[in-house]
């Protein structure tokens, strides 16, 4: 129980907690966890907090009758984030009538019809340097963003759109008709190792734009938020859009939720479910679950079915029928458009077993398809795979069908999905094509970072 060992274990426990999404732990919980790891008395741990605090390795904060203990880096990240948000929160004086007239013109041009909350969101966006727009699925966030984009376009402003994941950025591009990038791409990631990867865009080289709109904010953790804000010069407008009821970020900190709960910034909450969304039982039921109401399970629905089965093998047969026959027939979905989700990794209905079965069924062995065994897994050309950790050094490129490179960059992230297009035993490489046509060549040494993705855990699906 040397002091050095105790202190190292305290810092290790805080680091583990950050991997579970926490920027701090209550003192009692930290003491209990450290004591359990080291098998020593709690008093010995308690007396080391002061020394760590003096060395500025941890920060102790009183909140009500609870002491919260942060690792210093996360504490300062949160404090700096709050300061930078305040600096962006500039008020602009624009007359109501002027904004309303312009909204009316946009509605006429586009055929969109805004409700009062959406109009309020546009007004707040015009009058404030920083705005948060939040609401559940189907509440018109996209229509609101589209109106805001058109409004500022008429002002001749430069607008950047971004989202935390490749898939969210692709979706944002489709719904707005403007190019959206991942936040990492917008900030121009340079390939360091995970801890030291930096961005070319920062406080000394900020983004050259008038307005930044970030979608799917619930997935942004404190580390990425801090990097983003450093790259936004005061005077640039920032609009954050998201749904706080979605799963929080995998990384530490519930940034969106904390910004809203602080009540320090302008927030517009969209609550009305629009007509086209109110015919979607997925959206209606999501709102019911949020309100703690019973979900309607009649299987006349077009998009929400509940099939009750009790034995693992029977459940698997139902899934196989759906994926292979019923869904392709009824909704014209290819097996790659269908995602099977399960809560666990191990067991009869875990990711590992399901992937083996689904692969056998959807992409069976074939003389024309090369494969590569890796641990318990077999990768085969045509397989659907997922990247399982952030790799800032992986190079990708986007090519035309004639092989000309049109774009290239670095970084493939936890949760990115793609298809294996080529396995080359001679070069010991496997090529995977991700969203947006980004192709990456993996050396066989890196195959630990990939897994089959016919079935994935619910936790991984949040991107």
Each language-model region and where it sits:
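Accessory, non-ATPase domains that flank or precede helicase/AAA+ motor cores in DNA-metabolism machines
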Residues: 1-101
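ASCE P-loop NTPase helicase motor core
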Residues: 24, 119-122, 127-300
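Residue-level signature of catalytic and energy-coupling elements of molecular machines
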Residues: 30, 78-81, 125, 138, ...
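Conserved nucleotide-binding/hydrolysis modules and their immediate coupling elements
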Residues: 35, 110, 221, 356-462
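Long, charged amphipathic helices and adjacent flexible linkers at domain junctions
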Residues: 90-108, 368-375
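Conserved pre-motif I regulatory segment
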Residues: 101-130
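Conserved helicase motor core of P-loop NTPases
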Residues: 244-410
């Amino acid at each position: 129980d040397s002091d050095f060992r105790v202190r190292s274990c305290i810092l290790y426990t805080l680091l583990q907690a950050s991997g579970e999404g926490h920027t701090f732990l209550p003192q009692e919980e930290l003491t209990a966890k450290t004591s359990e790891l080291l098998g020593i008395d709690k008093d010995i741990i308690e007396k080391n907090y002061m020394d760590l605090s003096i060395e500025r390795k941890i920060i102790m904060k009183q909140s009500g009758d609870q002491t919260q203990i942060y690792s210093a880096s996360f504490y300062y990240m949160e404090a700096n984030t709050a300061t930078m948000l305040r600096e962006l929160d500039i008020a602009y004086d624009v007359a109501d009538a002027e904004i309303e007239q312009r909204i009316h013109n946009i509605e006429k041009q586009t055929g969109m019809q805004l409700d009062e909350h959406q109009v309020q969101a546009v007004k707040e966006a015009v009058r404030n340097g920083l705005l948060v727009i939040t609401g559940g699925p189907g509440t018109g966030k996209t229509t609101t963003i589209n109106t805001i984009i058109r409004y500022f376009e008429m002002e001749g402003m430069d607008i950047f759109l971004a989202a935390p994941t490749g898939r969210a950025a692709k979706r944002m591009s489709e719904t707005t008709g403007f190019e959206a990038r991942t936040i990492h791409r917008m900030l121009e990631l340079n390939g360091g190792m995970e801890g030291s990867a930096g961005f070319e865009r920062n406080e000394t080289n900020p983004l050259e734009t008038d307005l930044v709109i970030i979608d799917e904010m619930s997935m942004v953790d404190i580390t990425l938020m801090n990097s983003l804000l450093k790259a936004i010069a005061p005077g640039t407008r920032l609009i954050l859009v998201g749904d706080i009821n979605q799963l929080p970020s995998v990384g530490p900190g519930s940034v969106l939720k904390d910004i809203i709960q602080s009540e320090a910034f302008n927030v517009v909450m969209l609550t009305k479910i629009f007509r086209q969304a109110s015919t979607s039982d997925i959206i209606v039921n999501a709102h019911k679950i949020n309100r703690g109401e019973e979900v309607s399970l009649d299987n006349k629905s077009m998009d929400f079915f509940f099939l009750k089965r009790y034995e693992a093998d029977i459940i698997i047969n139902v899934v196989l029928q759906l994926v292979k026959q019923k869904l392709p027939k009824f909704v014209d979905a290819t097996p790659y458009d269908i995602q099977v989700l399960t809560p666990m990794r191990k067991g009869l209905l875990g990711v590992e077993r399901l992937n083996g079965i689904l692969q056998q069924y959807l992409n069976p062995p074939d003389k024309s398809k090369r494969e590569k065994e890796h641990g318990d897994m077999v990768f085969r050309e045509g397989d659907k795979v997922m990247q399982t950790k952030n790799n800032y050094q992986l190079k990708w490129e986007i090519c035309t069908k004639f092989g000309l490179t049109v774009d290239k960059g670095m970084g493939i992230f936890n949760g990115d999905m793609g298809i294996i297009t080529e396995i080359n035993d001679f070069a010991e490489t496997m090529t995977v094509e991700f969203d947006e046509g980004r192709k990456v060549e993996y050396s066989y040494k890196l195959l630990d970072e990939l897994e089959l993705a016919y079935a994935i855990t619910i936790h991984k699906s949040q991107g």
